[in-house]
Amino acid sequence: MRNQLYLMADDIAQTARETFPGAQTHLIGGDSRERHDIIEDNSVDLSFTSPPYLNNYDYADRTRLETYFWGEAKSWSDITKKVRNKLIMSATTQAIRSGFDKDHAMSDELCSVAPCVAKMLQNKVSQLVALRMVKGGKKSYDLMVAGYFNDMLPVLREAYRVLKPGAAFVLIMGDSAPYGVHIPTDIYLGEIGVAIGFTRYEIEDLRVRGGKWKNNPQRHSVILKESILTLFKN
């Protein structure tokens, strides 16, 4: 997996050399939720990413072929320790119920920075807590939703720190509706971004999602979408 990452970095570097002679690329391995002092304040012209979609997709499991092949993992628990536990929360397979306070699911930091959003999210989590008790499978969507936004807050904060005034943070993402409870991910993250310090945000809808499941009787009826969220820093 590490070799593949370096191959991708080489491709980017080659493209940069051919398109922008003299340009340099630097690969920084790290967690986007953490501060990286190598990137100075107000030094970045553009930040562009697509964070995990809040759709219970186990991104860690998608590394199974590579981690097994390279001998970095031999079991589900190995992948959990080495990959799954390190990712931004986006799947119920990452959720740990022990110690979870369903009435205070949102982090203290999120409640302090964006109390209105935190209150709306707490309401969504409470709905999911109740639905979990009557639904088959008892999926931990409540933990998933709370964990996702708690994890994304420091990502937004760090992006704001490193971006230059006048720069933008662009995110491609999808909304979610676990157990039919709609989570407008782009709006919530946009509002959190403004609470952090971004001046404003714009949302551009790209496409409708989930159409292939429309004939599934167990599927919710919420129409989902993929969108571009752009946060502007002045």
Spans of model-derived segments:
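A short glycine-rich, Lys/Arg-flanked "PGG" loop and its adjoining helix->strand segment in the class I
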Residues: L153-P165, G193
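SAM-dependent methyltransferase catalytic-core segment centered on the flexible catalytic loop
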Residues: L54-R157
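Short alpha-helix
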Residues: V155, P184-G197
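C-terminal target-recognition/interaction regions appended to catalytic cores
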Residues: S176-H182, L189, Y201, S221
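Conserved S-adenosyl-L-methionine
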Residues: T199-R209
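Core SAM-dependent methyltransferase catalytic element
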Residues: K164, Q218-N234
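SAM-dependent nucleic-acid methyltransferase catalytic core
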Residues: M1-F48, L54, D58-D61, M120-S126, ...
